[in-house]
Structures are given as structure tokens and as C-alpha cells.
Amino acid sequence: MAKVKMKTNKTAAKRFKVTAKGKIKYWKGGVSHYNTKKSSKRKRQGRKADYVPENIADRVKQLIPYQV
């Protein structure tokens, strides 16, 4: 029998990146349109990447098994 490989969730693979230290980085959404009503602070913070909290990082790692 052939060995069964885990499938990578392609949606998650496009949205998350694993850093050299093993943290999971993601980019915030919601700043591509309808920006006139948003404050400058909110738009500026949306440009920055952020890290997935540790309590859900394990679930994200299951979605991207070959990037970890």
C-alpha cells in the first residue's frame, strides 16, 4: 500500500508563513477598500503583519503540515 500524505490546506498556505523561530505570521485583512471611513491609525495598523496567538497556532500548523 502507498503511504498516505497529508493534504495542505491551500487557503491557509496562502495566508500564513512560518518564521525561522517557528512562529506563524499572518497579514491583516480589511484595508483594501472602504478606507475613507477608517481612521489613519486603523489603516496603519492594518499594514503590519501579526503573529497567530499560541493557543490556536497548533490548529493552523495542522493546515500547513509541510511548511512547519
Curated annotation (Swiss-Prot):
One of its GO terms (biological process) is translation. The lineage of its organism: Bacteria, Pseudomonadati, Aquificota, Aquificia, Aquificales. It comes from Persephonella marina (strain DSM 14350 / EX-H1). Keywords: Ribonucleoprotein, Ribosomal protein. It comes from the Bacteria. It holds the Pfam family Ribosomal_L35p. Gene3D superfamilies: 4.10.410.60. This is Large ribosomal subunit protein bL35. One of its GO terms (cellular component) is cytosolic large ribosomal subunit. One of its GO terms (molecular function) is structural constituent of ribosome.
